[in-house]
From Swiss-Prot:
Transmembrane segments: none annotated. Expressed by the skin glands. Belongs to the frog skin active peptide (FSAP) family. Esculentin subfamily. GO terms for biological process: defense response to bacterium. It is found in: Secreted. It holds the Pfam family Antimicrobial_2. One of its GO terms (cellular component) is extracellular region. It comes from Odorrana jingdongensis (Jingdong frog). Coiled coil: none annotated. Disulfide bonds join C31-C37. This is Esculentin-2JDa. Has antibacterial activity against E.coli and S.aureus strains. Its main location: secreted. The lineage of its organism: Eukaryota, Metazoa, Chordata, Craniata, Vertebrata.
Length: 37
C-alpha cells in the first residue's frame, strides 16, 4: 500500500542523493590532487 510506495520513493531518493554526493566527492578529490580547487 502507501507505506511500500513511500519506502520505494525514499530508497530512490537515497540512491540519487548518494550518486550525486559520490560524484561531487570524486570531483573534489580530483581537484585537490591536481591542486585546481
Amino acid at each position: 500500500g502507501l507505506f511500500t510506495l513511500i519506502k520505494g520513493a525514499a530508497k530512490l531518493i537515497g540512491k540519487t542523493v548518494a550518486k550525486e554526493a559520490g560524484k561531487t566527492g570524486l570531483e573534489l578529490m580530483a581537484c585537490k590532487i591536481t591542486n585546481q580547487c
